[in-house]
Amino acid sequence: RVPAFGTAITPGTQVTKTIDFGTTGCPLPNGNVVKGQIIITFVFNPGATSHTINYQFVDFYHNAIKYEGNKTFTRTMTTATATSPSHPIVTMNMDMTATFPNGNSYHRVGQRVREIIAGFDTPALLADNVYQVTGSWTTTFPNTTIQTSTITTPLQVKMSCMAVNKPLIVSGVIS
């Protein structure tokens, strides 16, 4: 629920917002169907250089696939230097399970760090943005096989190389 107009939230306040798609399925304009809840929590602190937002998936389904677990995003601003303006680094930690209608479950735990390394000083122009991505994750498959993936050479994503509304990875190694 949105607080009544005029109700101020003070810095340091824990905020919890629940997106409730109901229990019967909510069709989206693109044809996907969702149900369940996503609970978003964060501490309101507008002056901080770091912000963390947690997403908890509760009985959440997307096109009959059940998603359970948490994703946490932490956005931190770097300190400006003589050669680099202050820019954001976003760290995503996840511990999620996807269960398909046939009962197969996939569990993934991991971390991804995305840093904008070029283009941050031109906020109105997204095409010049370049991101560097690092991280690692472990996936457990239904047959209990475990696969660990690690970005051994940072991935570079250039927004100028967008194809079909998706930016492309132009370099880097995942092993």
List the predicted regions and their residue ranges:
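Low-complexity, intrinsically disordered segments exposed to solvent
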Residues: 1-175
